[in-house]
Amino acid sequence: MSEAGVLKFAENGLLADISSMYGEGDAKPLDCLTFRYDGTPVAYSAANEVLNLWYNNDLLKEVCEKQGIDPSEVTPPADAEDAWDWDTFVQTAQKLTLDINGKNALDPDFDPDNVDIYGCTINTLPWQLEVWAKSNGSGYYSEDGSECTIDSPETIEALQKIADLSDVYHCAPPVTSAANALESSLGSKKVVMATDGAWNVGTFLGPSADFDYGVGVLPYMKEKVTICTGGPNVVFSTTEHPEEAMEWLKWYYQEENSWSLIEAGTWMPILDSWYTDPEKTDKWISNPNYPDKDMYKSAVVDYAMNNAQSTSWYYVNGTEEFNATLDSVFSSVWAGEETMEEAINENLEELQDIFAENNG
C-alpha cells in the first residue's frame, strides 16, 4: 500500500489495530516508521528510507583544485554533531559554484547567467521539502497532526530559503522536476551536492554512478533533523485471522526476507536491533555496494536512528492531495514570479480545506 493511502483506509475502518504485533523483548520497528490513526498503530513500513546530502566527490575535488581550496573544508559532514548550519551550507555551496570563467559565487565578478558547475541542488518534491520546515521549528502540520501550519512564519521562511539558493545566491540550478533525481543532478557532473533518499545507493549510486560519491547529513536551520518513509504492509480489519496475519507480517518484516534489497542499498532495515547491534549493523553496511563504511554508519545509520522524524503521511490524512496542490503552488516561486509567502497565502484557503476535509 502507498504511504499516503494508509490513514484513509484506517479512517474507513479497514485496518486492524496492530499494537500487539511486537511483544516485550522483541526487536521492534523504529517508532518513526509507525503509521498511527487516532494514536493507534495501524501499519509499519516494510523498509526504511531517510533523506541525506549526497555529493560527487570527484567533482568536489576538481572544483577545489581549481580554486586552491582544501577539500576537507567543503566536504559535507557525516556526523550530525558536525552538521552545517544553513548559512555555512549556503556559503559552502557558493564556494563550490563556478561560472565559465572559473569564478565562484562569492566573487563580486561572478557571472550568474553563465554557470558551469553548481554547488548544490535541493530536491523540491513537496514531501521532501517538509524536512526544511521541520528543521526550522515547524512543518506543514503540528506534531500531533491536528493543525495545518503551512502558513507558519517558520515554514514559509524555510521554504523561501530553498528558493533563494537559485534566485539570490546562484549556487543551485533553476528548479525543474526532472532535476530532482540524483541521476539528473549528481549524474550530470555539473552539481556537487544534492539531497535525496537513501534508496539511491541501490538504484543509482552503487550500480550505475561512474564517479566516487559520498554521503553527509543534511544541513540544519534550527534543529538537526531528517525525515523517514517506507511503503507499508497492513492487516485488514475484515480478516478472520488477525493474529495469524500479524504473525506472518512479523516474520515477513525480518530483514533476512528482504536481504537482497538491503544488501544492494535500496532498502534500509526497519527493526531497531539493526541500528543498535554492532554485529547486525556491520553485516548490513560492510559490502561493496555502499560508500565508506564509517561514513555511511554515521551519516545514514546513526542519523536515521537518532535524528529521523516521521514524514507527515504517518499521522496526517490527505497528504497526497495536499502535496499535489503544493507542487502547483510552489511552481510560481520556482519561476521567480512570487515569494513563498505570497504563493502560500494566495492558496491558503484551498490548502486548509484539503486538510480539514481529510482530518475532520
For the regions a protein language model found, what residue spans apply to each?
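Short helices/loops that flank or line small-molecule/ion binding pockets
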Residues: 12, 60, 88-96, 179-194, ...
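Short, solvent-exposed loop/beta-turn-alpha elements that line the ligand-binding surface or hinge
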Residues: 16-28, 71-81, 110-119, 138-157, ...
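Hinge/lid segment of periplasmic solute-binding proteins
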Residues: 1-54, 61, 87, 108-114, ...
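Extracytoplasmic/periplasmic solute-binding protein
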Residues: 36-47, 51-53, 81-148
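Long, aromatic- and glycine/proline-rich binding clefts that accommodate carbohydrate-like moieties
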Residues: 209, 216, 263-328, 332, ...
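Glycine-centered hinge/linker elements that transmit conformational signals in sensory
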Residues: 90-95, 131-133, 143-176, 205, ...
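Extracytoplasmic/periplasmic substrate-recognition and gating elements
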Residues: 39, 206-273, 328
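Short helix-initiation/N-cap motifs at beta->coil->alpha
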Residues: 3-4, 81-88, 173-187
